[in-house]
Amino acid sequence: ISSIKSLPYKNQGLAGRLTYDYDSRYFIEGNFGYNGSENFAAGHRVGFFPAVAVGWYVSNEKFFSPLTDVVSKLKLKASVGQVGNDQIGGDVRFIYLGTVANTGSYVYGNYTKTSGERVNEVANPNVGWEVSTKQNYGFELGLFNKLEIQGDWYHDVRDHIFVRNNNIPAYVGMTTVPMVNIGKMKSWGFDGSLEYHDKIGQVNVTGRGTFTYANNEILRNGDALNKYPWMNSVGQKIYQKFGWEAVGLFESQGEIDRSPIQFS
């Protein structure tokens, strides 16, 4: 493993951007990334990840001029795009290759253990990029040239997450189940800020506050289904804690006698 890590790293990429501004009212920007990674096998090394963003400066419109004494700024914006991630194997390089280990032993014939090599990681030549599809919708609002309000709602879906496929049953005979691009999760939330600035005499007064709400949900993670649905992590937040929920303490012998059997 150490000798593999000492090999030179190689990544290639091509990026482009095109922006357009019409009369400081309408804005559009397009981006793309065309990236190649050594971490994947031939045929899966290159990924194309586009993005586009648009904006409308409403307060710069002629029809809006009668309102500018009150609404000094109004801008609407939206964006959607994809981002690729090739660093999905941790510190392991060439994650599409299988590995063997000279460990373990098996019993044959006269019950003597015979050592040998075993499959440590199953090869997966189809492993590829993890892809994140991001959306963002926001606004910028200014009032009386003193108060600035900004808000952004975002939604992010990460697909092809590299996880172990624990749905493979033990009778298949694998000592280690393969890593595959089957994980998926989504996250969403809102970021907001409020800023006030004014000048009182020779003193500049500024105040700022922020607000953030974030949530997420596991959509698919390769785990085998549990006996009870509430034990499954799919549909829950990432790093969700599981455990028994206490309902209280016994306050009398009668409550103990009427209660179900308790587990120690």
What residues fall within each predicted segment?
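Extracellular/periplasmic, surface-exposed regions of secreted and cell-surface proteins
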Residues: 1-245
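Aromatic-residue-lined binding/catalytic grooves and analogous aromatic/hydrophobic interfacial grooves
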Residues: 252
